[in-house]
């Protein structure tokens, strides 16, 4: 039951194709289209070119300086790494630096029982990195897992530290992706895009995470602290620690604001001879700006802080009394910034005026899945062994976090690790006034990250936000530690992008073999676009011919298709 209107339309279409074949039947090819040009956009990502890691032992025997008294026993030790130079060569990099160490010790050879000693051990380590060249830039992170100082005899010590070095070089990768097809003449003339006749296009949006090249900087914390009124003047600084905590960053336009706190502990010999030792534990605020010409407020930061080796000097106040502490601590920064980008690309195209061939290339890219930060609270009760002096008062506590196991599981990352604590305290024994206690607190934690899979990769950072140590009695203390664990998670994605187009005259022989009108039954997974492309027509023509209001079709739908030829 075909209506008169439909019959009339079919007759006109059939007549058109009959006349078309009769007119052009003796021509091998037809081509009346406008020359076309593929408009390209470049996807730029920074990826790891090569990386390498080593764990090594830094050790040496060091003599006690002649100006220092004999060592009876070591109370506390501290070490830090300082990198001075990174040299790139073919397939390897060489890291130069020094291990700086400091120790507190007791001596019976002097009127004062507590003394200190400092020193440094230079090192040069080679890390193999395949594909590295001498023109690359290497970023190196490091960690001092353990620093032990043992007494050989009263005039010599053995320093032994386990250090890890993790180096990587990045490479900028670019992918050209077709975003449109326009008239070649218009493109050369700088005119607005002109759509060639008979060209049909489909677009899609791809979302990827664009990253800036990794860069380095140093944020120097400088401040002056004045002793409280109840504290005596300083004669000699014996020992100090400076630890940044609760560091926060905020991206501004072309700069980064850094805030937080600096925990400061100093043990010193006062000018007052009646008091043989004094200490101060305090905090000072951190607030500063680091310039960065590649960041903006909309970006997502990935900033790693690596505290360097600080310095503390005493200087006189306005009254000439030694009551001002001048402190400086460098924070080595490794920075990378991420930005989510939505790029409209040309997904597919064909022409009813010419033969259009598309060259496609598969590309892979990263998508930022999530950046999250968790707080972990751990606690334990610690008892010194019987050989240690009984605790009179706790001076300070420091610690480090060590992740031993990490595994991606369903909707999260499972972590296992320890918090290693080093506690300095005043004893009940005046002959041995200082003691230290080492303790290890294990912990487990599950970071909930919806949608994470084993194929994804992530970057993990751990920091200690707070340490609280209180005495329960002279033989037991309670330690509470607040940890901050942050993760930035990436997932891989991919698609095919059009990189080149090639146009040629239409093949008349092929067109002649195609029927002018086709009755088509929609099958599974068929789209109006695919049907139109296969049968030399357009989605708009199919919709008009079949009275459709949208491109949505369903299996079993019956369609009439009319062949379309443009550019004649």
Which sequence ranges carry the predicted segments?
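Generic low-complexity, intrinsically disordered sequence content enriched
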Residues: 11-13, 19, 23, 103, ...
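Acidic/proline-rich low-complexity IDRs
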Residues: 8-10, 14, 18, 178, ...
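Interfacial loop/beta elements and low-complexity acidic/Ser/Thr-rich segments
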Residues: 32-512
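Detector for intrinsically disordered, low-structure N-terminal pre-sequences
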Residues: 1-3
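Short, Lys/Arg-enriched N-terminal segments with co-localized hydrophobic residues
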Residues: 5-35
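Primarily a LysM-type cell-wall glycan-binding module
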Residues: 506-544, 549-568
């Amino acid at each position: 039951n075909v209506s008169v209107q439909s019959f009339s339309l079919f007759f006109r279409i059939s007549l058109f194709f009959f006349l078309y074949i009769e007119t052009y039947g003796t021509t091998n090819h037809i081509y009346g289209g406008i020359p076309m040009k593929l408009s390209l956009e470049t996807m730029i990502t920074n990826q790891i070119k090569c990386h390498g890691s080593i764990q090594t032992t830094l050790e040496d025997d060091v003599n006690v300086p002649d100006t220092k008294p004999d060592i009876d026993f070591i109370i506390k030790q501290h070490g830090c790494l300082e990198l001075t130079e990174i040299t790139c060569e073919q397939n390897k990099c060489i890291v130069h630096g020094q291990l700086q160490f400091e120790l507190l010790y007791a001596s019976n050879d002097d009127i004062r029982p507590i003394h200190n000693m400092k020193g440094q051990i230079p090192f040069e380590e080679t890390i193999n990195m395949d594909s590295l060249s001498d023109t690359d830039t290497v970023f190196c992170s490091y960690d001092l897992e353990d620093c032990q100082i043992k007494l050989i005899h009263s005039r010599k010590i053995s320093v032994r530290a386990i250090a890890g070095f993790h180096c990587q070089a990045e490479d900028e990768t670019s992918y050209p992706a077709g975003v449109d097809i326009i008239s070649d003449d218009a493109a050369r003339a700088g005119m607005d895009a002109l759509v060639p006749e008979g060209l049909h296009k489909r677009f899609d949006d791809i979302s990827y995470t664009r990253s800036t090249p990794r860069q380095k900087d140093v944020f120097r914390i400088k401040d002056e602290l004045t002793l409280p009124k109840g504290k005596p003047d300083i004669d000699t600084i014996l020992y100090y620690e400076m630890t940044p905590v609760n560091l926060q960053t905020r991206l501004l336009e072309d700069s980064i604001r850094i805030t937080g706190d600096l925990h400061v502990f100093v043990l010193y010999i006062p000018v007052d001879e009646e008091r043989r030792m004094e200490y101060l534990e305090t905090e000072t605020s951190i607030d500063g700006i680091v310039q960065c010409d590649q960041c903006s407020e909309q970006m997502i930061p990935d900033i790693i802080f690596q505290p360097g080796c600080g310095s503390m000097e005493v200087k006189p106040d306005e009254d000439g009394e030694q009551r001002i502490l001048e402190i400086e601590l460098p924070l080595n920064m490794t920075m990378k910034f991420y930005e989510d980008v939505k790029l409209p690309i040309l997904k597919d195209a064909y022409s009813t005026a010419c033969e259009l061939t598309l060259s496609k290339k598969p590309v892979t890219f990263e998508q930022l899945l999530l950046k999250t930060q968790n707080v972990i609270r751990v606690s334990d009760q610690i008892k010194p062994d019987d050989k240690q002096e009984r605790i009179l008062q706790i001076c300070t506590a420091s610690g480090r976090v060590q992740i031993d196991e990490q595994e991606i599981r369903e909707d999260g990352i499972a972590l296992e690790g320890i918090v290693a604590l080093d506690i300095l305290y005043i004893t009940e024994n005046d002959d041995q006034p200082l003691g230290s206690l080492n303790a290890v607190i294990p912990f487990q934690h599950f970071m909930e990250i919806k949608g994470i899979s084993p194929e994804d990769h992530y970057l993990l950072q751990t920091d200690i936000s707070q340490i609280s140590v209180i005495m329960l009695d002279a033989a037991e203390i309670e330690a509470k530690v607040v940890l901050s664990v942050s993760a930035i998670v990436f997932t891989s994605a991919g698609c095919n992008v059009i990189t080149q187009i090639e146009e040629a005259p239409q093949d008349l022989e092929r067109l002649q073999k195609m029927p002018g009108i086709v009755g088509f039954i929609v099958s599974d997974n068929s789209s109006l676009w695919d049907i139109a492309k296969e049968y030399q027509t357009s989605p708009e023509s199919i919709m008009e011919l079949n009275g459709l209001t949208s491109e949505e079709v369903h299996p079993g739908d019956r369609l009439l298709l009319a062949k379309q030829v443009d550019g004649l």
